[in-house]
């Protein structure tokens, strides 16, 4: 009986102390989330949500993505690229103040979130070009 009681106390203590997170780990997680968000977001100087959504869709298609869903009211576009592996991206467009649109892209390769800044940079470079050409009415 005493052996079981001791074993339960030891297991309970191990579980309790094993779940405690340090302040450093919490801060590290928050910092990496902020850093990841900086890769994933860009603000554009336009108040036209529909045109921004059209540019996002055109950019994804130019990058060989196949559209899964697009919802103007929600400001969400989902697309998939199949080239040896599955890359899924979800882009949200929302107003930022009265004169800007905030575009955020989230990508997943297979089941893992893409944390490398390069794919996001490539997407936003292509989107910036598309937005520029659209603003200057160049086809």
Question: Regions from the language model: what does each represent?
Answer:
Residues 20-139:
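Ser/Thr-rich, low-complexity intrinsically disordered terminal regions
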Residues 15-18:
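C-terminal motif of bacterial Sec signal peptides marking the signal peptidase cleavage site
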Residues 1-9:
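Bacterial N-terminal signal peptides that target proteins for export
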